[in-house]
């Protein structure tokens, strides 16, 4: 089934009816700005035989076949929008998505796979992508649909490393609190498609990557581990991440050996800037966390609130970020700084959670929970933390909301 677009915000205790409606409208505006179908429709249009992509024109008469590949939680919805534009011009396609994030398509196969930890289905689906891309020639056009979760969903370990090895290391990195940049530096050097290697495999075909960014600042080499962009990280960097989190001794030996061989120059590096693999590649970011945050601020101002975009570069432990945000809300309640009521503060970014024990949740639920005590007793105050892709960790929730009455 296709994932529901319904928005259900339940924790309204502590807010009067008017404020409830405002919170929901602001959240909906942010989500609409990140909507995958709408983003594709804004970026892709067909005029006769000319395909316009992010302002660049492609004459389809110059191509024999058009393929669609991709991976990510929003990539099925993106595929639907692409099919609506290109129809029967698509010769075939394959997209890996998270369980429950499927959609009805005709030319593009939608394949469910493991997320946030990859599973055997991720590998099977990635092999299908390789099969499509590998047969492409310089007369073919490949549309690559990338969105949040693409790193796990497009997983294909290098020879000699098993999925079990990869899963063990990924789990350790997640529990350690490693940043997405650090995790991607490791993944790129243990797999066959990440770090520009999909572009290298597709060359000399023309590649257009439509990208929904869930990463701070939207660096192309970080989003979904950058399958179509130059990789700035190295084997040495990947080894450094394992050392930083004391994982050398506990990581699977096959992984440590491979990274050490790469650091010694015995394994080819991922393609860097200037590599011929990128001569016919266009990377286009069609939606981002920053755009969602800006849309939220615009809606808040439209509703008559004093609104401020604090930052779209928020990082750190979710519980620590929660304390800072709660402190700012308390300052507004106490002194009207930095904004007088009625106020709306918006922040975007990517926090991390260091797992202690066996709890289930995600960074947004963790952040909201950590704000319960600091906000206790405040009237008409709410903190909403949500993932714009509709998924917060291994749960069916997008996030959570806390008010001044949640503790009671």
Language-model features, listed with the residues they occupy:
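N-terminal amphipathic/basic leader segments beginning at the initiator methionine
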Residues: 1-61, 77, 237, 246-271
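A glycine- and small-aliphatic-rich helix-loop capping segment at beta-alpha/alpha-beta transitions
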Residues: 81-90, 107-109, 157-168, 200-204, ...
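Extended C-terminal subregions enriched in glycine
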Residues: 310, 319-323, 334-335, 341-342, ...
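Short beta-strand segments
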Residues: 69-71, 94-97, 143-148, 174, ...
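Glycine-rich oxoanion-binding loops at beta->alpha junctions
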Residues: 96-138, 186-187
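Internal gly/pro-rich beta-alpha loop/helix module
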Residues: 159-172, 176-253, 257-258
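Active-site cofactor/substrate anionic-group-binding motifs, chiefly glycine-
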Residues: 59-62, 71-102
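Accessory alpha-helical/coil subdomains and C-terminal extensions
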Residues: 187, 205-208, 230-324, 328-333
């Amino acid at each position: 089934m296709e994932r529901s677009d319904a928005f259900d915000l339940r924790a309204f205790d502590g807010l009067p009816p008017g404020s409830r409606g405002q919170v929901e409208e602001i959240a909906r505006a942010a989500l609409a700005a990140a909507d995958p179908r709408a983003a594709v429709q804004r970026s892709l249009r067909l005029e006769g035989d000319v395909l316009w992509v992010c302002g660049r024109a492609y004459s389809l008469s110059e191509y024999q076949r058009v393929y669609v590949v991709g991976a990510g939680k929003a990539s099925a919805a993106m595929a639907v929008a692409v099919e609506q534009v290109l129809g029967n011009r698509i010769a075939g396609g394959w997209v890996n998505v998270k369980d429950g994030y499927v959609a009805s398509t005709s030319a593009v196969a939608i394949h469910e796979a493991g997320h946030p930890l990859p599973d055997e289905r991720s590998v099977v689906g990635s092999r299908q992508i390789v099969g499509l891309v590998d047969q492409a020639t310089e007369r073919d056009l490949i549309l690559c649909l990338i969105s949040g979760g693409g790193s796990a969903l497009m997983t294909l370990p290098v020879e000699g490393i098993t999925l079990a090895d990869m899963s063990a290391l990924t789990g350790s990195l997640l529990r350690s609190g490693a940043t997405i940049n650090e995790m991607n530096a490791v993944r790129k050097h243990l797999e066959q498609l990440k770090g520009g290697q999909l572009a290298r495999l597709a060359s000399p075909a023309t590649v257009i990557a439509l990208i929904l960014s869930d990463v701070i600042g939207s660096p192309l080499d970080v989003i979904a581990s950058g399958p179509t962009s130059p990789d700035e990280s190295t084997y040495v960097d990947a080894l450094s991440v394992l050392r930083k989190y004391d994982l050398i001794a506990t990581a699977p030996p096959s992984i440590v050996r491979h990274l050490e061989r790469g650091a010694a120059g015995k394994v080819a590096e991922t393609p860097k800037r200037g590599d011929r693999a990128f001569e016919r590649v266009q990377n286009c970011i069609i939606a981002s966390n920053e755009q969602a945050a800006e849309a939220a601020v615009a809606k808040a101002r439209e509703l008559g609130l004093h609104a401020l975009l604090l930052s779209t570069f928020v990082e750190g432990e979710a519980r620590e970020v929660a304390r800072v945000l709660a402190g700012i809300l308390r300052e507004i309640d106490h002194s009207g700084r930095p904004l007088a009521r009625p106020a709306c503060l918006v922040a975007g970014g990517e926090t991390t959670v260091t797992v202690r024990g066996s709890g289930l949740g995600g960074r947004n639920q963790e952040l909201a929970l950590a704000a319960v005590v600091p906000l206790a007793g405040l009237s008409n105050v709410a903190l909403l933390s949500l993932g714009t892709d509709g998924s917060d960790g291994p749960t069916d929730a997008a996030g959570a909301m806390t008010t001044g009455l949640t503790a009671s």
